[in-house]
């Protein structure tokens, strides 16, 4: 690979034996750097980082993530001190020191489960320990599972946070834990964390908005998918909300950063990365578009690292939450059921009058769910609602069949069943709609017809990859329509809403005269999505987070995706080609095996060298594989991720893992044979009599809801 020299140097130095030995002198040097970083942070004036206006933050950091940012930024500054004074060679030894300190803190934390004191007798150690976040520190007031993974709790119950899913490495896949990198390294200008701004030829990289305008504008290319419906896009977004949540950096006071100004990296925070808007832009009339860098949660000396705030597993985080306190806000604690809002004659999630992102005024409150992005746009709430209703329906069945079960027993059993159903839907219905059979076969993603999956391994890291989160799984943004049609139960039009006018507005859910959210669900099932290609709808490209009546107050999501890749240190597109078996590229012409001539020319018009092509742009312009919706690079990254989520999840619905209360073979068969998204939708809509047999194909023939098999709860009552 043709890596930049600074990146190659950093990688080589980490692979070489450390020049510095781990001894008292090294520990003194490391401790001095950490103390200086702490002192520097304490002395800096935080007033400039406070925002002066309300900013919508879709990736809002919770208390644990803010704690992780504190740790990450101290380690980031300490890294720069060490590298400046001793060179990159000291970092391996420094990380051995920091690992020992971390282990000491973990032991202290575990001992606190049986003792009442966690005081540090050594003042220096007490100060040093401040850089380590205590797991679930913010949730001490909530009920939390034991930290010890050998506790019986972790045998039978999947923790809300993902803690102890892997009992040998308790943090793998846990909420507020680092993303992994497919290539094992990052592409930053300085090898550590500064965003790349220069071309390999020495000039400036093109602005993300310039790329979006020239390559991704759909004005003359609005093509609908011939088969895939709009629900496929929404379920894809729901999956993304389940496993991907990269919180944005916050100001020192914990508030949102205002990164709107072009000079905000200097005037507000180095965690600002505004996007230059070209002159005479067709929509925006400001010089820059706001973007806050993803929160730095690095846990060692070295490269900046992003974190996943939700658990990394397919565990219905949007329904149940990924933090213990978060989980308690959605439960009724009666009969194992979830909270709902039922005052309008139909069911919605509970209202949230304190949602800081909500743009609609009372009484049109946004909602409380396991993921606070639930009200991002009106099409998400129907999915949240049917899953909450399905949980409560099953909980009622368990209550009747087992009257002696208490609230916790009912809740945990139904949650386990719901997650099993969800995983089956993802692997059996969603994935086959866009990945070709060959990719599904190569990554062993297809559910088994019978028997159990014995591929679980503690050595498999289920964590979400930076490439999946920052590029590959964002392909669904191309599927989004500008308009979201509403249909009656008989398929008659009931109006529509525009995506760009309804970001974090909930009033569409309160239209009682047409049945609230059900017409939105009908429209998603029966209407096509946009074709997955390089073109994006007007709302996606211009109006994300726009305030009604204020044109240009939002952002371009495509520009954000491109700039986010640079922020995350993703390598340019061509560095990933060899990974998926494609030939190396040194000229634009050599892209002709995976790109159309039209798309190659589009790239030439923006980039000066193929080595500059951003990963997101590259994967969106690749020609789709036969039988699939995506090209080879995105297909590989998505297939690799879902394989990791299957083989690295001890509680995966088809798996049998030692020391784990997995589903029995009979229960697995029940899930395989009777779970379908169509049935869940049918069962939990008041006015649904017929449904598509293929739930993600808008052309599919419809059948009576009563003809679809229903899960038998008795099969799960041992």
UniProtKB/Swiss-Prot annotation:
Gene Ontology biological process terms in this record: defense response to Gram-positive bacterium; response to oxidative stress
This protein's GO CC annotations: extracellular region
Catalytic residues, chain numbering: 241 (proton acceptor)
Traits of the deletion mutant: RNAi-mediated knockdown results in reduced survival in response to infection by E.faecalis.
Entry EC number(s): 1.11.1.7
Biased composition (Basic residues): 126-139
S-S bonds: 149-164, 262-272, 358-366, 682-705
Expressed in which tissues: Expressed in the hypodermis and gland cells of the pharynx. Specifically, there is low and transient expression from the distal bulb of the pharynx to the anterior of the buccal cavity. Whole body expression levels increase upon entry into the dauer phase.
Keyword Iron: yes
Compositionally biased tracts (Low complexity): 109-118
Positions of heme b binding: 477
Catalysed reactions, semicolon-separated: 2 a phenolic donor + H2O2 = 2 a phenolic radical donor + 2 H2O
Pfam families: An_peroxidase (PF03098)
Main location: secreted
Subcellular location: Secreted
Family: Belongs to the peroxidase family.
Name assigned to this protein: Heme peroxidase 2
Gene: hpx-2
């Amino acid at each position: 690979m043709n890596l930049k020299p600074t990146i190659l140097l950093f990688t080589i130095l980490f692979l070489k034996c450390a020049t510095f030995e781990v001894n008292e002198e090294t520990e003194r040097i490391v401790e001095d750097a950490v103390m200086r970083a702490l002192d520097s942070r304490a002395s800096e004036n935080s007033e400039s980082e406070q925002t002066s206006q309300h900013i919508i933050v879709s990736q809002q950091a919770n208390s644990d993530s803010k704690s992780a940012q504190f740790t990450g930024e101290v380690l980031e500054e300490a890294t720069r001190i060490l590298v400046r004074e001793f060179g990159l060679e000291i970092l391996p030894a420094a990380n051995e020191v920091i690992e020992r300190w971390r282990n000491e803190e973990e032991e202290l934390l575990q001992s606190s489960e049986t003792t009442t004191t966690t005081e540090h007798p050594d003042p220096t150690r007490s100060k040093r320990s401040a850089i380590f976040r205590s797991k679930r520190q913010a949730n001490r007031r909530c009920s939390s599972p034991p930290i010890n993974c050998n506790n019986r709790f972790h045998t039978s119950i999947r923790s809300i946070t993902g803690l102890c899913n892997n009992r040998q490495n308790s943090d793998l896949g846990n909420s507020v834990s680092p993303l992994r990198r497919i290539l094992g390294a990052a592409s930053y200008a300085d090898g550590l964390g500064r965003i790349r701004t220069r071309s390999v030829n020495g000039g400036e990289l093109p602005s993300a908005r310039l790329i979006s305008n020239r390559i991704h504008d759909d004005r003359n290319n609005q093509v609908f998918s011939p088969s895939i419906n709009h629900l496929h896009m929404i379920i894809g977004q729901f999956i993304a909300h389940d496993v991907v949540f990269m919180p944005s950096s916050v100001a020192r006071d914990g508030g949102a950063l205002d990164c709107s100004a072009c000079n905000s990296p200097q005037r507000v925070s180095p965690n600002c990365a505004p996007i230059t808007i070209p002159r005479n832009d067709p929509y925006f009339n400001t010089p820059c578009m706001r973007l806050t860098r993803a929160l730095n949660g690095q846990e060692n000396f070295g490269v900046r690292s992003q974190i996943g705030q939700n658990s990394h597993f397919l565990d219905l985080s949007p329904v149940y939450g990924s933090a213990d306190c978060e989980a308690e806000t959605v439960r009724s604690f009666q009969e194992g059921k979830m909270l709902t809002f039922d005052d309008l004659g139909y069911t919605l999630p509970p209202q949230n009058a304190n949602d800081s992102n909500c743009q609609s005024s009372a009484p049109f409150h946004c909602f409380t769910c396991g993921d606070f992005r639930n009200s991002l746009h009106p099409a998400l709430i129907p999915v949240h609602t049917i899953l909450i209703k399905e949980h409560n329906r099953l909980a009622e069945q368990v209550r009747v069949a087992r009257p002696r079960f208490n609230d916790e027993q009912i809740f945990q059993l139904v949650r386990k069943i719901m997650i099993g159903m969800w995983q089956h839907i993802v692997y059996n219905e969603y994935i086959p709609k866009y990945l070709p059979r060959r990719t599904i076969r190569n990554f062993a993603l297809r559910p088994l017809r019978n028997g159990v999956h014995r591929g679980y391994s503690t050595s498999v890291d289920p964590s979400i990859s930076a490439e999946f989160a920052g590029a590959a799984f964002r392909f669904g943004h191309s599927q989004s329509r500008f308009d979201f049609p509403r249909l009656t139960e008989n398929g008659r039009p009931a109006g529509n809403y525009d995506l760009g006018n309804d970001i974090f507005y909930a009033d569409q859910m309160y239209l009682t005269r047409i049945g609230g959210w059900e017409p939105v669900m009908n429209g998603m099932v029966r209407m096509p999505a946009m074709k997955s290609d390089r073109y994006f709808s007007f709302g996606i490209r211009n109006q994300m987070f726009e305030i009604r009546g204020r044109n240009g107050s939002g952002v371009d999501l495509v520009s954000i995706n491109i700039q986010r890749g640079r922020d995350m240190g993703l390598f340019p597109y061509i560095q990933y080609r060899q990974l998926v078996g494609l030939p190396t590229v040194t000229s634009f012409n050599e892209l002709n095996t995976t790109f159309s001539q039209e798309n190659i020319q589009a790239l030439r018009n923006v980039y000066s060298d193929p080595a500059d092509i951003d990963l997101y742009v590259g994967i969106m312009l690749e020609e789709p594989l036969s039988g699939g919706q995506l090209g080879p690079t995105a297909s590989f990254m998505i297939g690799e991720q879902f394989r990791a989520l299957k083989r690295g999840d001890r509680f995966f619905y088809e798996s049998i893992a030692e020391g784990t209360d997995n589903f029995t073979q009979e229960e697995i068969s029940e899930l395989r044979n009777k779970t379908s998204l169509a049935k869940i939708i049918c069962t939990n809509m008041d006015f649904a009599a017929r449904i598509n047999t293929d739930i993600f194909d808008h052309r599919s023939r419809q059948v009576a809801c009563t003809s679809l098999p229903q899960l038998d709860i008795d099969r799960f009552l041992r």
